[in-house]
Amino acid sequence: MELVVGRIARAHGVTGELSVEVRTDDPDERFAVGSVLTGRLPRGGGSRRFTVESVREHSGRLLIRFAGVSDRDAADALRGTLFMVDTTDLPPIEDPDEFYDHQLEGLAVRTLDGAAVGTVSEVLHTPGGELLSVRGSERREILVPFVSAIVTSISLADKVIEIDPPEGLLDLS
């Protein structure tokens, strides 16, 4: 299974530098100078390998220069490229209360009394903390704060997350 660790948002400047939205908790390792990344090109363009030549932080995003991308036109053509890693290459997590996002995506969510809420479609990382984006009935999105007071148990074996939502949380949309 492949996991997205970043996305090219846009070109930055005229020398081929790219603004990358980071979707990994270890950007220093993933996007280190000399790293080789697999990028899935937008609009069915296939995949390509990218070698990081330089990297710096700017306004909450990484600005990265890749080998072979030397001007704005070349950089613009890469907008929307997703950087992927194979989940088998990820190190195991030793803490039983920590999970990779992809382990939670697809799990059923139910309340403590067993009522079905929906399925986790993605884990959102926001400045205020992590949220579980849960698709409920009629494809309605419910954002559940990923905190121990609400998310009471996670069973990867049973593919279930149990929540104890505060009053009104499930009524918001």
UniProtKB/Swiss-Prot annotation:
NCBIfam families: 16S_RimM. Belongs to the RimM family. Its main location: cytoplasm. Binds ribosomal protein uS19. The PRC barrel domain binds ribosomal protein uS19. It is found in: Cytoplasm. The gene is rimM. This is Ribosome maturation factor RimM. One of its GO terms (cellular component) is cytoplasm. InterPro entries: PRC_barrel-like_sf, PRC_RimM, RimM, RimM_N, RimM_N_sf, Transl_B-barrel_sf. Residues 95-169 form the PRC barrel domain. PANTHER family: RIBOSOME MATURATION FACTOR RIMM (PTHR33692:SF1). Pfam families: PRC_RimM, RimM. One of its GO terms (molecular function) is ribosome binding. An accessory protein needed during the final step in the assembly of 30S ribosomal subunit, possibly for assembly of the head region. Essential for efficient processing of 16S rRNA. May be needed both before and after RbfA during the maturation of 16S rRNA. It has affinity for free ribosomal 30S subunits but not for 70S ribosomes. GO terms for biological process: ribosomal small subunit biogenesis; rRNA processing. Keywords: Chaperone, Cytoplasm, Ribosome biogenesis, rRNA processing. Gene3D superfamilies: PRC-barrel domain, RimM.
